[in-house]
């Protein structure tokens, strides 16, 4: 079962919850606001599917690609406003625009009304505004992998941008390659504490006697 994984090794991808056939895995917030899995032993049938999809436990099997050598490119969006609204050059916006033009679904992290972060996917080109730019906070992906799999099985094209652990988790969850799926990940050191983040938002709102209405993390 997934509880064999030491807490400090858990990457917080949430994929074990989507994979559990009995809904025995839920997630709780620790004292820093990070989400961790919890197993209801009454529902668990010890099938170990949660272990089989875990990107940390199966990291060696997931370290594969089709390139003899890595191919490296540098890119920046031509539109200055897009670069300003993005975090690191606007490349995602270019990929997303192309995907939307082909009627594809685009997924990634978005801000919620309370400035928490969750995973989101749609084929609405207007959603690019909330999908672009980095968030730097742990994202709630509960239910997301199942949604992506359903869209892929329906034959729809999907472009998905996420952290390396999220992309590895998705590929492990899908169990096979899909020709209609393109994934984008990025170099990621860690995600910040959601609880500290919310404390920071509260600090700003108290300091300026106003609600936060817009966020840009380019200089944070």
What is each PLM-predicted segment?
Residues 1-8, 109-113:
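Small-residue-rich anion-binding loops in enzyme active sites
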Residues 42-43:
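Short, charged amphipathic alpha-helical surface segments
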């Amino acid at each position: 079962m997934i509880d064999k994984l030491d807490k400090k090794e858990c990457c917080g991808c949430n994929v074990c919850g989507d994979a559990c056939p009995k809904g025995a895995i839920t997630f709780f917030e620790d004292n820093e606001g990070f989400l961790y899995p919890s197993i209801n032993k009454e529902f668990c049938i010890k099938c170990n599917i949660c272990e089989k999809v875990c990107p940390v436990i199966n990291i060696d099997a997931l370290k594969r690609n089709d390139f003899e050598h890595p191919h490296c490119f540098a890119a920046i969006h031509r539109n200055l406003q897009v670069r300003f609204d993005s975090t690191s050059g606007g490349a995602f916006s270019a990929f997303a625009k192309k995907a939307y033009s082909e009627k594809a679904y685009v997924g990634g992290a978005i801000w919620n009304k309370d400035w928490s972060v969750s995973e989101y996917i749609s084929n609405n080109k207007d959603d690019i505004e909330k999908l672009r730019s980095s968030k730097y906070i742990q994202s709630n992906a509960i239910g997301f992998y199942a949604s992506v799999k359903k869209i892929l099985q329906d034959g729809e094209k999907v472009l998905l941008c996420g952290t390396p652990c999220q992309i590895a988790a998705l590929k492990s969850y899908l169990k096979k390659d899909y020709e209609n799926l393109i994934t984008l990940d990025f170099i990621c050191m860690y995600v910040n504490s959601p609880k500290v983040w919310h404390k920071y938002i509260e600090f700003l709102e108290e300091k300026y006697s106003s609600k936060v209405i817009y966020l840009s993390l380019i200089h944070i």
